[in-house]
């Protein structure tokens, strides 16, 4: 799968100076499956907007976004539903967890739809992220960094061609963010998938084949 932006920019960004951007309104920006991309920018530069456009939940943009040469605007609701189940996994900046459910229940809710990971595989990921003792606590009482780790585990419980990650390490310490990122890269490699990750600042501890300034 290939995602291509052609002179694309979200409409609200037209009011800003985007002259230094390596993404907005460029002739062609290509994201290829199997490759890793880190998009760096301060707040308000449209990082969430970019991922929301690619995921199909934001349509207020100028230019074109194509997936394997098919404009996203041509996709039906049914096609988008299938893509979000099989081709795109998303770690939302706001996480979108259910506070009244436990960490485990939030994860299993996704895995019950996809049946992609075994209970043992989920437990192993949780151990690697230092979350094994928090899996049966309500998501609403976990720290934001712990919630981010729950969202990461959940995102890995489905097949995907691209993983979209919106500032998913912002409240995780450097050691655990490095562990989490390596888990993500390992899963992407196993699935032959790409990752598009947004970040507020340059993360020297996170490696990527491509870095772009938004």
Set out the residue ranges of the language-model regions.
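Helix-to-loop junction immediately C-terminal to a conserved catalytic motif
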Residues: 55
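Conserved ABC transporter NBD signature motif
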Residues: 63-72
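Conserved ABC ATPase "signature" region
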Residues: 119-134
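Conserved ABC ATPase signature
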Residues: 138-142, 146
């Amino acid at each position: 799968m290939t995602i291509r932006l052609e002179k694309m920019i979200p409409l609200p960004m037209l009011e800003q100076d985007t002259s230094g951007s390596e993404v907005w309104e460029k002739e062609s920006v290509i994201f290829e499956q199997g490759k890793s991309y880190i998009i760096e920018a301060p707040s308000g530069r449209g990082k969430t907007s970019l991922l929301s456009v690619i995921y199909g939940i934001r349509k207020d943009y100028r230019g074109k976004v194509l997936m394997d040469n098919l404009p996203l605007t041509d996709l039906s609701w049914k096609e988008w539903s299938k893509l979000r189940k099989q081709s795109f996994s998303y770690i939302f900046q706001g996480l979108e967890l259910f506070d009244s459910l436990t960490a485990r229940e939030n994860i299993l809710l996704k895995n019950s739809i996809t049946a992609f990971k075994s209970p043992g595989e989920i437990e192993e990921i949780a151990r690697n992220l230092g979350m094994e003792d928090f899996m049966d606590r309500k998501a609403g009482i976990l720290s934001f960094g712990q919630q981010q780790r729950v969202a990461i585990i959940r995102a890995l419980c489905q097949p995907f061609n691209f993983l979209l990650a919106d500032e998913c390490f912002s409240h995780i310490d450097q050691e655990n963010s490095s562990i989490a990122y390596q888990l993500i890269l390992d899963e992407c490699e196993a699935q032959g998938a790409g990752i598009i990750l947004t970040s507020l600042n340059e993360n020297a501890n996170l490696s990527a084949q491509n870095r772009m300034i938004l």
